[in-house]
Amino acid sequence: RVQATFFLLGENMEGRRKMVEELVKDGHLIGNHSYHHVQLNKLSIKEAMGEIEKTNRLIREWTGEAPVYIRPPYGAWSQELEKVVDMIPVFWNVDSLDWKLQNKEQVLSCLSGQVEEGDVILMHDGYQSSVDAAFALVDHLQKQGFVFVNVEEMVLE
């Protein structure tokens, strides 16, 4: 069994409460990915906070816990947001390009030989090819001795 962190888009959560509850029940960590997948650093602070807070409310209401971590869409973050957002921004150092390739074999090829201990791999759940690639990647990396943890466990280490 693998632990992961799912950074959820508020607009994609709508109508999927059971799925979110299942993720939590399965021991995964839930983080915020904004409401509309916009570049937060291009918005006013008030608009950016609205994007974050709207998704935080949904997560808190559905899981009983306020999210601690946020993955800003496109990795777009600013010093101003850092000052006003009381959350820990999480970035990645390995991009699977799954959003662009939309092909399981190409995603696996892209990641082949790239992943090292301590890496944060960026993947998306919006494409079946990404989901299929994630399962195949987990199997492949576990056979190599990799252990999967959620973001919180990485931060605490």
Task: Please identify what each model-predicted range represents.
Residues 38-65, 76-117, 130-133:
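Alpha-helical scaffold elements lining the catalytic groove of polysaccharide deacetylases
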Residues 1-54, 58-61, 65-66, 138-140, ...:
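Active-site beta->alpha N-cap acidic-glycine motif
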Residues 11-22, 68-75, 95-102:
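Phosphate-binding glycine-rich loops and adjacent basic patches that engage nucleotide phosphates
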Residues 116-152:
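Catalytic grooves of carbohydrate-active enzymes
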Residues 70, 80, 152-157:
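A short, charged, Gly/Pro-tolerant segment at domain boundaries
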Residues 8-10, 32-34, 71-74, 93, ...:
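A cross-domain feature marking catalytic cores of carbohydrate-active enzymes
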Residues 15, 20, 30, 77-79, ...:
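A broad, structure-centric signal for solvent-exposed, well-ordered loop/edge residues
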